[in-house]
């Protein structure tokens, strides 16, 4: 961990997240890290689950050779990344938990892998394994060590959900009665939502603590979660299906420069996350730095300062991210000439070699506009940045070096050599460059943060940092042309909500990392309606007669009278693909359309542009709905393996919200039923008052307040507080 004290002669770049080499899957984090084999297996399993073998295969990745080697490696890696080390006694407790989980799961998998076995024994061993996992999970939610424990908790949840899925699909061969299978379906959907809630509690606590301490450490933790945690929380809900795709499109950030602390969760939710993201549906085109330096009477350079970062994007004259001598109003578009960046006029002093403070008159201050422009090539993206800032001695010398790819933007003129500091992630590119202002409010403000009005300015000349945002290469295709290109070989294609073609006014960027995407769209407060359109182009040779279905992941906490529509709008051929009646739900829901072909939509050639529209009629200020992603899947390879049928809903009325109408097209519909924590930075109904029995070591489950399925004959071990 680097020294965060800037009154030293240390190089202070705040780059604590290592670069990894190699790649496993184009849609996964490019990391040779402990969780990578697990993620790779899940990506395969989501395409095709090995019935009766899925859990055993997952076990071999999480506990190879019936040892906790992988989990130990996860802990050690994350401890190193975060500089947060578990105490030895806690490590020994976890070792005991791993041993108990390995032993009971090995007994079960060994037994059912025999050519012949008693179904009654298989049934008992299955539920012994499930109950052991449930009862041991609280040991992986470690108060005060949420940063490390979230990565361990995530894999134990993945392990349990894999067991439940195998039980649902293979239960009849393991002695389950129909009522047992129904109960497992109910349990699976409940635990997907409960585990996600508990995971976000861990994340919110650690992220909020680090924001207050130091922004660079908070971003370092966020990077870790983007690789070790959030792709798996996304996989949990996708385990309900076969034929989908696990794709992580979360950004990684590198922070260089002066430390920023005392940031609140509301600051992050307000302006800071928007600054870091830039224009979310556009690639970086160029970035300008408001840079100044000053010299003494002998023309010796003493201080070099970055006062603002102005990125522009390929979609138009957006100025999201402008920091430094800006104004909240009165700035005319386009903001492209140097006259818009005013001279820095505050008095600056320096400590001369005799120990005296001398004023530098404004005339001695030099302002420059330094510009870095992406390459004009077939691959118009920055791949690397070499950015370094150094205090040579407090108050005397400081300097910057800035280089994007092979182009030097700034080479320091201070009297010493600043070493290189290359920022790069394999299989990632630079999509946004920003900075965090000091001494200004970053609180939530709808008026200047809409996605249709990317104008975010601060008068903050004390800014002295640069934040580089890296996006995974799996998003490059969209950002080259602002369209999604579909090939016949794509059995599933993921469209993050922020990769839109157009979006209506009064739409906002919301941070939803558990969806494994760079945010979701929040629609609210409109008279005419809300809409996001997504452009689809078909690659040459595409079979337009292939049948597809479209999965829409959304959340609507308030009742929307007109519901949400899914439409195709192409060359005058407007087709309604589905209508979603929304009565209020605090959790994410998957809506799945009926099948269609592109011929049906009037798209008969690869040269025609198709549009999918997700929209609703107007909503008032007290209403909102969220859109996370679209997943286009081939009907021939797609199956809902864990359905949410009316009879399950009836038995779990306090666990799920879905209409009991048997014709309902909801395919996920889980509702966490936790009270929303109003102080949370996430407007998703997460509640950090969940209180598992951390001291429990016996073979039993939580004392849950869920409605037990009174018709269930399985050995659940739940102690429910609701009447049976």
Swiss-Prot record:
Instruction: List the cysteine pairs that form cystine.
Output: none
Q: Which InterPro entries match?
A: Pest_crys (IPR038979), Pest_crys_dom_I (IPR005639), Pest_crys_N_sf (IPR036716)
List the Pfam families hit by this protein, alphabetically: Endotoxin_N
Q: Which GO terms describe its biological process?
A: sporulation resulting in formation of a cellular spore; symbiont-mediated killing of host cell
User: Is Disulfide bond there in the keyword field?
Assistant: no
Function summary: Promotes colloidosmotic lysis by binding to the midgut epithelial cells of mosquitos. Active on Aedes aegypti, Culex pipiens and Anopheles stephensi larvae.
The name this protein carries in UniProt is Pesticidal crystal protein Cry11Ba
The species this protein belongs to is Bacillus thuringiensis subsp. jegathesan
């Amino acid at each position: 961990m680097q020294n965060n004290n800037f009154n030293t002669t240390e190089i202070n770049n705040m780059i604590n997240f290592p670069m990894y080499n190699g790649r496993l899957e184009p849609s996964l984090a490019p990391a040779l890290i402990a969780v990578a084999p697990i993620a790779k297996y899940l990506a395969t399993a989501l395409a095709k689950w090995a019935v009766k073998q899925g859990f055993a295969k997952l076990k071999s990745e999480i506990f190879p050779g019936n040892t906790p080697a992988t989990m130990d490696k996860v802990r050690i890696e994350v401890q190193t990344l975060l500089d947060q080390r578990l105490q030895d006694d806690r490590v020994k407790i976890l070792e005991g938990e791993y041993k108990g989980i390995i032993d009971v799961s090995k007994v079960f998998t060994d037994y059912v892998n025999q050519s012949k076995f008693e179904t009654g024994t298989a049934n008992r061993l299955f539920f012994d394994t499930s109950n052991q996992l449930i009862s041991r999970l609280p040991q992986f939610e470690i108060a005060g060590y949420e940063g490390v424990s979230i990565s361990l908790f995530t894999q134990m949840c993945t392990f349990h959900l894999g067991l439940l899925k195998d039980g649902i699909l293979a239960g009849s061969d393991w002695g389950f009665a129909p009522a047992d299978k129904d109960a497992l379906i109910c349990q699976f959907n409940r635990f997907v939502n409960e585990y996600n809630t508990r995971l976000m509690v861990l994340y919110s606590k650690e992220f909020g603590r680090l924001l207050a301490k130091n922004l660079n450490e908070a971003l370092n933790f966020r990077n870790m979660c983007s690789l070790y945690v959030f792709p798996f929380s996304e996989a949990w809900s996708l385990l309900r299906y076969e034929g989908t795709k696990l794709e992580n499109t979360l950004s990684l950030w590198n922070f260089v420069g002066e430390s920023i602390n005392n940031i609140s969760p509301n600051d992050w939710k307000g302006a800071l996350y928007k600054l870091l993201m830039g224009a979310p549906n556009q690639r970086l085109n160029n970035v300008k730095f408001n840079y100044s330096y000053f010299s003494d009477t002998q023309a010796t350079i003493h201080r070099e300062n970055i006062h603002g970062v102005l990125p522009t994007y390929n979609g138009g004259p957006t100025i999201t991210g402008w920091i430094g001598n800006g104004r909240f109003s009165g700035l005319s578009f386009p903001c492209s000439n140097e006259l818009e960046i005013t001279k820095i006029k505050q008095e600056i002093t320096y400590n001369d070699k005799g120990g005296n403070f001398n004023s530098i008159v404004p005339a001695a201050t030099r302002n420059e506009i330094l510009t870095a422009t992406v390459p004009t090539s077939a691959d118009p993206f920055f791949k690397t940045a070499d950015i370094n800032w150094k205090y040579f001695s407090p108050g005397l010398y400081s300097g910057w070096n800035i280089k994007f790819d092979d182009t030097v933007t700034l080479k320091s003129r201070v009297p010493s050599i600043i070493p290189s500091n290359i920022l790069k992630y394999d299989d990632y590119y630079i999509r946004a460059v920003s900075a965090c202002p000091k001494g200004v409010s970053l609180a939530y403000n709808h008026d200047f943060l809409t996605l249709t009005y990317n104008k975010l300015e601060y008068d903050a000349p004390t800014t002295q940092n640069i934040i580089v945002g890296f996006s995974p290469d799996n998003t490059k295709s969209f950002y080259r042309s602002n369209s999604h290109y579909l090939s016949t070989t794509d059995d599933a294609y993921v469209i993050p909500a922020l990769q839109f073609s157009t979006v209506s006014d009064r739409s906002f960027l919301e941070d939803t990392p558990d969806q494994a995407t760079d945010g979701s769209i929040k629609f609210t407060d409109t008279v005419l309606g809300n809409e996001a359109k997504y452009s689809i182009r078909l690659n040459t040779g595409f079979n337009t007669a292939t049948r597809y279905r479209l999965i829409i992941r959304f959340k609507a906490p308030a009742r929307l009278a007109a519901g949400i529509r899914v439409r195709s709008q192409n060359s005058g051929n407007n087709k309604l693909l589905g209508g979603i009646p929304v009565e209020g739900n605090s959790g994410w829901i998957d809506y799945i359309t009926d099948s269609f072909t592109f011929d049906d939509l009037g798209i008969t050639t690869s040269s025609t542009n198709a549009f999918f529209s997700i929209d609703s009629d107007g909503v008032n200020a007290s209403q909102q709905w969220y859109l996370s992603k679209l997943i286009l899947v081939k009907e021939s390879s797609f199956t809902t393996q864990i359905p949410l049928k009316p009879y399950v809903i009836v038995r779990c009325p306090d666990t799920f919200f879905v209409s009991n109408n048997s014709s309902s097209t909801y395919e996920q519909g889980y509702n966490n039923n936790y009270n929303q924590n109003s102080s949370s930075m996430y407007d998703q109904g997460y509640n950090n008052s969940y209180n598992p029995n951390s001291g429990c070591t016996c073979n039993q489950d939580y004392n849950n307040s869920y409605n037990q399925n009174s018709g269930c004959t399985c050995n659940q071990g739940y102690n429910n507080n609701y009447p049976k």
